[in-house]
């Protein structure tokens, strides 16, 4: 127990000794400090770093020293650290540093001193006696536990300025949370709205680009239908091909024609192409020299020859619009696919990388790994970079902790910045060894000679480049599979080629180090996106013809040389009819391609005006596509069955879908799940939904499936009974459980109604027997006057305002009252029109009366208040013969005088003066009679 207390330090309560023992320990410490300072120089620097302290702790005592040497040296080190701590404290206080940071440094220094004491005591445990342990305890006690010093220092650390503490009340917390929630919801709404808008713009751009490409195809097909070009093409065809009738054309005939065409016409990329000449002029020139500038012109020439032979031919175009999904949406998935490329330029898939990561590793004691770790820094750094980032935070193993400083320094040199690693990785070429089986699971790394001697590379060594081999892992199945996949992914390169050519080609193609870059490179390489189709009447089918590669009747070959992805393939015949033939050429049409295309309804609506009138031929082609799809094997991945046009899994069924019958045939299994035909998947509906389709559920039928309803009525029922919230309350029925709706019969002039007092007329077949529908406005008013039964017709429901509202269309009446209601309604409309006419006439007369009254008032006001203005008018005409400016001045003055003369107060003053001069006075009765026809404001 004594040793443990000495090594780790006793509690603070037991550190306090008697005054006598403290005095003795202080005296002994002062003597030993003097001896220590005589042997060692006082330190001039601040606290040493943790690394230097660790090295000094591992240092041994001087050889040949006495037995007390280690103890003295230990005392000296502890004393030096305490002195350094005091110096740091004084400097911090003198410089005015923040005192809140100093206790942490003091605490770290205390931990360092205690750690040093523990290490020294544990190393010298077997050599020192009990007294030595007590001396160490007494020496470290004053340094760690001086009560007076610590109390004074803690008082000095008290803050001088007042401290403000803010306490949030529950009401404030609720308000803050509510505002944060509202802000977050608004940001989410705004973000979704922006994404929705951007998605709509990108989709519209995709559609516009697709239509532009289709219009370009129409233009090219129209040029290839010109009779002049047909005549030129017919003139160069040998006679053995012109003697065959179009109905006798077969695949053998087309193969011979393609062979002759390839032998006659050549492709010369050096031919000139003038922008001023149109396509027709260019093709005429190409016929003259029996040559084409590119594959597109070659296809156009062969199309002219086939149409000159009166063969039904299509120009097939693989349209390449911008992708339907933007690049940002595709780039959401992280960089699992951004991996190192192999010699052929192909990248490892994520599954291969996972297999490589899970390979068992050999022990560290093997010679190969020692050579790889010590002699080659760049491959090891490259290997570390290729591994997952989650290993960076893992704790170091015990073997790494036991390594010496040399190994740590070597590891430190391997840690480079990311930019440095990329530059090194770009100079590394990967070479496969196909000859030896022992090194088949590994790979060789080498640098090109021109880049290995780069003077800017600090880690490079002079001399020829050395081959650096990676450690060969154990021969496991995963390793052999990954190696074989990597070998097959290198563009099917022949392993027998010379090493020099393979290394040079790999160094050129190794610049693309990620799979995304390779995809962009493959997409940039344009393929052959146009070929032909000829209808063989003997076989009654369309045969594809690739005149560039000399292939007839091989759709997969056309797909092989076309630009990927193949999304839209259309065929345009000589009459301009268009047919979507993507299903014939794309092998992944049912799984991948359909998801990359625009909405099927929009695309079908776009091509509907150009649909061929030969429906029998179109139906046979559809059956051919269906037979081709049925011959393909079942998909092996579960995700491919979702929305598959032929197959379905139970896990992918929607809420209102079910498989019927329950004993449906199982076509196969995918990972233990039964695969059913898509024809067995039926859509179920509730009773109300079937009624909208003019069908009702038969009596006694049990719901085929129960789901949770979300109508307002179902929600209210669940809220009323909490125990039924999780139960399925909506029964669904299949088509086989329903029958046609039988409309009721009208009896005694009464229209049959539903429980809401209306008539459901979702389809014309739901009309009650003996009734008719009249689409006349306000017919129910006329029927109410005549006491005839009239009911509104409900033709559907419209959801707005949070609820479903019925949509009405006309009225349902009995057939015997039809003529009476029509006559009464017409009479009612005549009366309404007459009343409207009278109302308009009355309003017009009132307006004319008001206008006449206004004119009379105007004349009366002129007579009463306008004598002076008329008298002043002749004075304005006296100034004749003036210039235009003078005339304008006089006219403005005259107008001002006229207005002043006609002002009401001045006229009233004149009238008062005339009254004062003389004349008979009017009585009040006369004045009242004279002012009876005036308005109130005129009587003032």
Curated annotation (Swiss-Prot):
Changing residue 848 to A: Reduces NER activity and abolishes interaction with CETN2. GO terms for biological process: DNA repair; mismatch repair; mitotic intra-S DNA damage checkpoint signaling; nucleotide-excision repair; positive regulation of DNA-templated transcription; pyrimidine dimer repair by nucleotide-excision repair; regulation of mitotic cell cycle phase transition; response to auditory stimulus. A motif (Nuclear localization signal) lies at residues 390-395. Residues 607-741, 767-831 are annotated as: DNA-binding. Changing residue 754 to A: Reduces DNA repair activity; abolishes single-stranded DNA binding; reduces binding to homoduplex DNA; reduces localization at DNA damaged foci. There is a cross-link at residues 41, 81, 89, 161 (Glycyl lysine isopeptide (Lys-Gly) (interchain with G-Cter in SUMO2)). Belongs to the XPC family. This is DNA repair protein complementing XP-C cells. It comes from Homo sapiens (Human). The gene is XPC.
């Amino acid at each position: 127990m004594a040793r443990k207390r000495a090594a780790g330090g006793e509690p603070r309560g037991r550190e306090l000794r008697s005054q006598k023992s403290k005095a003795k320990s202080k005296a002994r410490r002062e003597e030993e400090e003097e001896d220590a300072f005589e042997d060692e120089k006082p330190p001039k620097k601040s606290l040493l770093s943790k690394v230097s302290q660790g090295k000094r702790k591992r240092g041994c005592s001087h050889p040949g020293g006495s037995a007390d040497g280690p103890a003295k040296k230990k005392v000296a080190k502890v004393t030096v650290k305490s002195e350094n701590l005091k110096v740091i404290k004084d400097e911090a206080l003198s410089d005015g540093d923040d005192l809140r940071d100093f206790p942490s440094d003091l605490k770290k220094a205390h931990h360092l001193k205690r750690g040093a004491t523990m290490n020294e005591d544990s190393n010298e445990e077997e050599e020192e006696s009990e007294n030595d342990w007590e001396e160490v305890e007494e020496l470290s006690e004053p340094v760690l536990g001086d009560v007076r010093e610590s109390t004074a220092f803690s008082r000095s650390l008290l803050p001088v300025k007042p401290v403000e503490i803010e306490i949030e009340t529950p009401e404030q917390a609720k308000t803050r949370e509510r505002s944060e929630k509202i802000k977050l919801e608004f940001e989410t709404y705004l973000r979704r709205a922006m994404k929705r808008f951007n998605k709509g713009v990108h989709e519209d751009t995709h559609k516009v680009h697709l239509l532009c490409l289709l219009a370009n195809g129409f233009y090219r097909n129209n040029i290839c239908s010109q009779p002049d070009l047909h005549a030129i093409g017919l003139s160069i065809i040998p006679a053995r091909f012109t003697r065959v009738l179009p109905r006798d054309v077969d695949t053998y005939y087309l193969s011979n024609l393609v062979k002759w065409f390839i032998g006659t016409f050549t492709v010369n990329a050096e031919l000139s192409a003038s922008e001023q000449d149109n396509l027709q002029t260019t093709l005429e020139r190409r016929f003259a020299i029996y040559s084409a500038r590119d594959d597109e012109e070659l296809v156009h020439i062969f199309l002219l020859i086939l149409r000159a032979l009166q063969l039904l031919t299509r120009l097939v175009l693989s349209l390449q619009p911008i992708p339907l999904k933007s690049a940002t949406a595709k780039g959401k998935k992280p960089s699992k696919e951004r991996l190192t490329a192999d010699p052929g330029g192909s990248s490892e898939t994520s599954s291969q990388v996972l297999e490589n990561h899970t390979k068992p590793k050999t022990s560290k004691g093997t010679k190969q790994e020692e050579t790889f770790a010590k002699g080659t820094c760049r491959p090891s750094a490259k290997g570390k970079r290729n591994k997952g980032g989650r290993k960076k935070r893992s704790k170091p193993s015990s073997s790494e902790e036991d390594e010496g400083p040399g190994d740590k320094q070597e590891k430190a040199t391997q840690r480079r910045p990311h930019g440095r690693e990329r530059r090194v990785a770009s100079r590394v070429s990967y070479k496969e060894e196909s000859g030896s089986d022992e090194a088949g699971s590994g790979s060789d790394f080498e640098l090109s000679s021109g880049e290995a001697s780069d003077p800017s590379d600090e880690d490079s060594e002079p001399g020829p480049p050395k081959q650096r081999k990676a450690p060969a892992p154990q021969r496991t199945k995963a390793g052999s599979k990954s190696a074989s996949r990597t070998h097959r992914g290198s563009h099917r390169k022949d392993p027998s080629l010379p090493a020099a050519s393979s290394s040079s080609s790999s160094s050129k193609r190794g610049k693309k180090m990620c799979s995304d870059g390779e995809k962009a490179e493959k997409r940039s390489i344009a393929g052959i996106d146009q070929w032909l189709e000829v209808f063989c009447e003997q076989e009654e089918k369309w045969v594809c013809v690739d005149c560039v590669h000399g292939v007839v009747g091989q759709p997969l070959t056309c797909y092989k040389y076309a630009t990927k992805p193949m999304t839209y393939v259309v065929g345009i015949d000589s009459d301009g009819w268009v047919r979507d033939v993507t299903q014939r050429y794309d092998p992944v049409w049912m799984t991948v391609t359909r998801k990359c295309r625009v909405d099927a309804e929009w695309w079908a609506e776009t091509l509907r005006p150009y649909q061929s009138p030969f429906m029998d031929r179109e139906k046979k082609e559809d059956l051919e596509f269906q037979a081709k799809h049925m011959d393909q094997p079942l998909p092996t991945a579960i995700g491919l069955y979702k929305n598959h046009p032929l197959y379905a899994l139970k896990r992918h069924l929607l809420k209102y879908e079910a498989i019927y019958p329950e004993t449906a045939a199982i076509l196969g299994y995918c990972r233990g799940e039964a695969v059913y035909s898509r024809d067995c998947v039926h859509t179920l509906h509730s009773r109300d939904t079937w009624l909208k389709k003019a069908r009702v559920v038969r009596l006694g039928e049990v719901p085929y499936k129960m789901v949770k309803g979300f109508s307002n009525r179902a929600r209210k029922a669940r809220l009323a009974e909490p125990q039924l919230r999780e139960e399925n309350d909506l029964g669904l029925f299949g088509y086989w459980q329903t029958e046609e709706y039988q409309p009721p019969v009208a009896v005694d002039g009464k229209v049959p109604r539903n429980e809401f007092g209306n008539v459901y007329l979702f389809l014309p077949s739901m009309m009650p027997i003996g009734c008719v529908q009249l689409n006349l406005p306000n017919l129910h008013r006329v029927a109410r006057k005549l006491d005839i039964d009239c009911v509104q017709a409900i033709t559907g429901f419209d959801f707005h305002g949070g609820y479903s509202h019925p949509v009405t269309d006309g009225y349902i009446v009995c057939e015997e009252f039809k003529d009476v209601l029509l006559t009464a309604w017409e009479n009612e409309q005549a009366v309404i029109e007459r009343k409207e006419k009278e109302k308009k006439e009355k309003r017009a007369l009132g307006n004319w009366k008001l206008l006449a009254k206004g004119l009379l008032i105007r004349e009366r006001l002129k007579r009463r208040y306008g004598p002076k203005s008329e008298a002043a008018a002749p004075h304005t005409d006296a100034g004749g013969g003036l210039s235009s400016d003078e005339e304008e001045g006089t006219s403005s003055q005259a107008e001002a005088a006229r207005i002043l003369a006609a002002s009401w107060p001045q006229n009233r003053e004149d009238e008062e003066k005339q009254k004062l001069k003389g004349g008979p006075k009017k009585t009040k009765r006369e004045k009242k009679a004279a002012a009876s026809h005036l308005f109130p404001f005129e009587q003032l």
